[in-house]
């Protein structure tokens, strides 16, 4: 996973070049494939930016060439990230100074030397977009509830980088909260609550019943089995590229997976001790509900925007095509219950100083 995610860091620099063989199923070693038989597809398609295109473009194109049969490696789900030109141009020491840590980790995991051969990479699921709204003091719309780090939206746009994620967590935790949350606590008297409160009793009973239900199923499939099945469905139908056909197919398949989960999952252990299998079962149960919201939202938004790319909404050059007239709003879906249609809430996006325009990386 680490190797796959590091592509996003390397690709931001012009030293690494991404390519695949021009012939499908070419199993030769990268060094044995001559230049005229290589397709530097990002440089070919986006000559102005090449390998420095935004990550949504780079990721979508990588999956596209792999799905078309040009991928490399034993699974065919990889493309080459090649530093040979940069090494020849700048020298090994210069590249080592910039990427030595990454190259060393890749070598430890794969036993391949990136200084001698191209690395194999493939896009992986990254952070979801957005975050909770917070005010200047990092408090959400719920009084007393603060959101810090990547849980809030304050420093992140649609595309996130790991370094800025770390930065935000440190900044919020070390510098902002100590100066803001203390003021709130000093000004607000906390109510005296105990475990006999009606709300607590109701919530505790609901959680206990859910835990016992998960433990009592005693089925034949593990939590990981369902997690993997759900992940594959979402990756293929609601990942970097979405289509109406694929989203509708996923909306048909998801309830079946969810139904089987609650009938056939096997969660070992008890609820009386630390039980990581039970913890994960709870998370996957949540994923099975949240995934449906993602599918419904992706199907409803008939445009391409940011990381949401609908194949029906693209330019002749294959770029994301927005529909600002109909979809210039933030969508929030209200949960109405399992197998019930959620309610859509809209907040219009109004731009007074900036004119919306079509992006291009040609």
Where are these regions (language model features)?
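Short Gly/Pro-enriched turn/cap motifs at secondary-structure boundaries
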Residues: 8, 121-124, 299
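Glycine-rich, aromatic-lined ligand/substrate-binding cores of catalytic
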Residues: 78, 84, 100
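Alpha-helix capping and helix-loop boundary segments enriched in small/acidic/polar residues
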Residues: 1, 90-93, 116, 160-168
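Single conserved hydrophobic/aromatic residue that forms the stacking wall/gate
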Residues: 1-11
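Short, structurally constrained coil/turn elements
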Residues: 3, 74-75, 115, 141
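Accessory "access/gating" subregions that flank catalytic or transport cores
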Residues: 90-139
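Glycine- and aromatic-enriched mobile tails/lids
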Residues: 12-31, 35-61, 65-74, 127, ...
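N-terminal export/ancillary region detector
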Residues: 86-88
